[in-house]
Swiss-Prot record:
Entry keywords, A to Z: Plasmid
PANTHER family noted in UniProt: UPF0261 DOMAIN PROTEIN (AFU_ORTHOLOGUE AFUA_1G10120)
The keyword Lipid biosynthesis belongs to this UniProt entry's keyword annotation: no
Any Pfam family the entry gives: UPF0261_C
Protein name (database record): UPF0261 protein y4oU
Length: 402
């Protein structure tokens, strides 16, 4: 029978977690209730399948008892133990958790540790806000609890029932990944680089399973997570725009580890300057006051773009080149001299040859070129069909060299 793990703190959410467990069993799955309570006064319940003490034993470096009197430290320790506990279980067909801010922070890392494709649902009081820190580069389904996860009432019963039935439905109707003999490659795309990425995909999809990632911070992390997991044979990183948000302060930042997967794996890497002309913010009224006098462009009602300056482009180019210098595999980084996005062209709002020149010069100055690590400048726009052809040609050559 398919097994769903139900995870939460039974000292404060016991009724809700048992309700989830019972509904999942009624739907036709086995359910394992895992208690991750951290209260020192919590007594073990007989109907819990896995007690907190059992989970805690999986912590790789058990904290001192006195440290666990601090709730924050106790939650962090239990979260780490839960990750290792879940990884050790061979029968996790699906998992569901429920909690407030503390419970969400405790449970989410374990869900992130599971493979992509394993059903994961998290009912949370914080699911209507920024969930990126909880979801990360994974496929967690977060559901807003509407009311607090504090007792069963006419609202929580419906929300929790929907969550229970959703995870059970996913487990009972799991779609196996289609068998595909083509090797997989990752590509990064942004709205303003779409023509380029679509052209590259069309040229390669007969021979490769092309996985396109939206460069929104977590998109780049997902791209590199698959590279680290040996699920890709290479990457065509057209849209490195997340670096702008990381260095300047936008809402779609990469992490300090951007490009790290290709340094670690030495997989063939072909990259470019896609959308390095912009930093992303939300709606216009969310743009920080220090940037209000800058060149701004409303991409849509929820996304405002800010043009990167020559000084920022210099930093961006240096940072990317320094990261690529760590890559010992085949690296080809292509510079489209006539513009790096759809709105970086003559007559478009972000056309700024001075800023682009600063970016390109920083890349040239900083990248340590070798026979395997190359920088290629071409008099083309990033969305020109010929540029896509060059990306394809260089990727095929990089694969042959690998």
């Amino acid at each position: 029978m398919n097994t769903v793990y139900v995870v939460g703190t039974c000292d404060t959410k016991g009724g809700e977690l048992r309700y989830l467990r019972d509904l999942i069993r009624q739907a036709g799955c086995d359910a394992v209730l895992v208690d991750v309570s951290v209260s020192e006064f919590h007594s073990q319940a007989a109907d819990v399948d896995v007690q907190p003490s059992e989970v805690a034993r999986f912590h790789p470096n058990p904290p001192k008892p006195e440290d666990l009197k601090d709730r924050g430290k106790a939650v962090a320790a239990m979260a780490q133990a839960l990750v290792e506990f879940i990884r050790s279980r061979p029968d996790v067909d699906g998992i569901i958790g429920a909690g407030g801010t503390g419970g969400t922070a405790l449970i989410a890392p374990a869900l992130r540790a599971l493979p992509i494709g394993t059903p994961k649902v998290l009912v949370s009081t914080v699911a209507s806000g920024n969930v990126a820190p909880y979801v990360g580069p994974t496929d967690i389904s977060m559901m807003y609890s509407v009311t607090d996860v504090s007792g069963l009432n006419r609202i929580s019963r419906v929300v929790l029932a929907n969550a229970a039935h959703s995870v059970a439905g996913m487990v009972l109707n799991k779609v196996s990944a289609a068998k595909d003999e083509r090797p997989a490659i990752g590509l990064t795309m942004f709205g303003v680089t779409t023509p380029c990425v679509q052209a590259v995909t069309r040229a390669l999809e007969a021979d490769f399973d092309c996985l396109v990632f939206h460069a929104t911070g977590t998109g780049g992390q997902s791209f590199e997570k698959l590279a680290d997991s040996a699920l890709l044979v290479g990457g065509i990183d057209v849209s490195t725009t997340e670096v702008c948000d990381y260095l300047v302060g936008g809402v779609f930042p990469c992490t300090a580890d951007r490009f790290g997967a290709f340094a670690r794996t030495r997989l063939p890497y072909v990259g470019s300057c896609g959308a390095l002309d912009m930093v992303n913010f939300g709606a216009m009224d969310t743009v920080p006051s220090r940037f209000r006098s800058r060149r701004l462009h409303v991409h849509n009602p929820q996304v405002t773009l800010m043009r990167t300056t020559p000084e920022e482009c210099n930093r961006i180019g240096e940072w990317i080149a320094e990261r690529l210098n760590l890559c010992e595999g085949t690296v080809r980084f292509l510079i489209p001299e006539l513009g790096v996005s759809a709105i970086d062209a003559p007559g478009q709002p972000f056309h700024d040859p001075e800023a682009d020149s600063a970016l390109f010069a920083a890349l040239e100055r900083t990248l340590r070129r070798t026979t395997k690590r190359q920088l290629i400048r071409v008099p083309l726009h990033i969305n020109d069909p010929q540029f896509a052809e060059l990306l394809v040609t260089n990727f095929k050559e990089a694969l042959r060299e690998h």
